[in-house]
Amino acid sequence: MNIFKKYRKSIVISSVVLASIVVIILVLQLIIGSIITNKIENAIDKREDNQYKITVGTVKINLFTMTLILKDLNVTPDSLYLKGLASKSVKQPDILRVKVPVLRIRNISILKLIRDKFIDVGSFVLKNAHIDVYTDGKTITSKDKKPKSSSALFNFDSIPLPGIGGGRIGALKINEFGINLINVNKGDTIVSANSLDLALYDVELLKNENDSTSFMLKLKDVDFNMSNETFYLPGGNYILSFKDMSFSMNKSLLVFDKLSIKPRYSRSKMVSLSKFQYEIYNVDIERIEINSIDLKQIIRESKFFFSSIDVDNMKLNIFKDKHFPFDESKRPTLPQQMLKALKKDLNIDSITISNSELEYSELHELMKEPMIVTLGNFNVKVKNITSVVDSMINGVVMTINLKANLQKTIPMEVDIAFPMKSIRDTFMFSGYLGKGEMKIFNPIVLPAIGVKFESGIIDRIDFKATANTIYSIGSMTMLYHDLEGDIQRKDMVETNKFLSWVANSVLIQNNPIKDNDPRTVPMYFERVMYKGLGNFLWKTLQSGITATIVPTMKSKVQGQIDVTKGTSNKDIRKREREEKKKNR
């Protein structure tokens, strides 16, 4: 008690002083808050741009925690400005509508800001913000395009910010951010995302030594997350969705869980969108991991270098309606041609697809049901995917290894090698097919050559070939026994019994024939230039199959090879005549 009396006066004085400080701080908060509000309002009023209306609900400042709070910040486009976006005939700049319920800037260093013009902030927190981006859907014509000064997506090494001495943000967090991309001409939402989370850590602006008004951006880490989002892909005919997407700059890892790409419309409507036949895709993927992503390299240099892309448990369905004609004006490129034509540097050490399934189906005019080919237990390894010129000059070879079970039962393997240095884009492919019933080929060969296998066993098929962008040449050894087949009528439903009897009398029913060595036959196919790699490979193999089972086809295929190589009897006689003329 005596101690309390002794220090009573000091305690009272301290309490009064502390209370006074609190009152002063509270008064200052009101004053500073009012000043900041007036500054913001004046800045908005002085804007010369009348295309947007900017409003702020309330401004608060907490001097105890040095926190600035902005509530109900809205950026609204003028109605006439928005209406004019759809009426212009050429590409117009996109228009934004922004809603920010709450923006918190915490731990602001006032002293550094006043003394050094250095922006030092503990955290920048944005919650439940939403942006609508309105676009006219038009593309920029070549004459409207401005030349880029460099290949960088954005120059983070030279950010112009005159009037400040630098900056640091401990953490920039954007939570539950939403964005819509809206085509005003079609009244269609192209992209919609409503749960985007972004976190940037230790964001620094470092002044460039050779330019006092520009800064270099440094980031310690970036975390980016999205959940249950849906997007329309370019063209508007497919929808991309995923359950979760996450990116970590520290881990250099981008992950998608339960990703799918689906047609936007029914199959019949998708088919009707073109007057030509084309592939319709439907994809479900359990998980995708993209490793060793260097975000700084992508932004600064536009170089996309990844160590691996791993795709697990993919279900890929491809459908084509062959009632429609081919688009003969198309010129699909082969994989190595596509990489050589890239304008950006791309390098992926490996792409792995595992535990997957591919189903390809075609609906033919003369067949009631679609032809379906299924590759079960589908596993693919692609190595050395690159568009880097130095790598190509040094002789890098891109390789593809595919392992699967044809129609889910017969084991098969295909290897393809693309020497990227090849001037003629030469490539090689080889592989095998294991033991199974010949009937398994019916969905493939019936629409192609009108033959339906009734019995027979494939013991093994081995093949190898060399190809370029124009033709392929190779060889096949197809071992089988007890082959019998039917020749189908034009409607592909009924059997032509007479032709089937003739065919079975002529077809080579066993390879090897008893007491003979196995027949190895040539393969040849001249590429149809408006079709892709898959058709090129299959037609090459088809030439080997027909050359094996049909006696006359072996000499026909060999004749095609001789003509291509210039070694046919006709070519030899022509050269002999030319030599005789020279010697006269």
Regions found by a protein language model. Give the residues of each.
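Elongated, acidic membrane-bridging lipid-handling scaffolds
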Residues: 4, 13, 17, 117, ...
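Extended terminal
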Residues: 2-17, 415, 419-420, 432, ...
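Sec-dependent signal peptide cleavage junction
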Residues: 2, 37-45, 142-159, 163, ...
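Short secondary-structure subsegments characteristic of cysteine-rich extracellular domains
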Residues: 124-128, 309-313, 459-469
